[in-house]
Amino acid sequence: MKIYGLYGKSGTGKSYKSVEAVSKYGIDAVIDDGILIVDKIHVAGSSAKNERLMYAAIKKAIFFSEDHRQEVIDAIRARHIDSMLIIGTSQRMILKIIERLELPKNVQWLPIEQLQTDNELMIARERRNKGYHVIPIRPIEVEKTYSGWFR
């Protein structure tokens, strides 16, 4: 399996640009904030964005819980995935996710600055400061994945 690691600071538009990276590199699946996404559909895991505390969100994003970790490992193994994009805030975080999910350690690194213009980075930061989140799944999947956000 070919692994791509998209990394950058929080609020820089990684999830937004992941759609472009998936298309450009022909990537089959994405790991973003604790969920496995295939064809823009949430297929396994639970989102770190649902956590109220930063510490809990980080643990969720790196698959600290054994049940969460195993659910995603099983889903990956049940599918024919030749390439995967892992989104994280640092290379270290992505390597931790790779280790926890027992994925190949050879990573093609994609810094967000390689995919974003300075203007796009500025817009992403402004949106993040307003509390907006981009999620690389189909709109129909959003409420199922992010329960409680719309009430």
For the regions a protein language model found, what residue spans apply to each?
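Glycine-rich phosphate-binding P-loop
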Residues: K2-V22
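Fold-independent oxyanion-binding glycine-rich loops
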Residues: K9, G34, G88-S90
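Polyanion-binding and phosphate-handling cores
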Residues: V19-E20, I27, L36, I87, ...
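Conserved nucleotide-sensing/catalytic segment adjacent to the nucleotide-binding pocket
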Residues: D28-L85
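Helical/strand "switch-coupling" subdomains that flank nucleotide/phosphate-binding cores, especially
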Residues: I76-Q108
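C-terminal accessory "lid"/substrate-recognition subdomains
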Residues: V107-R151
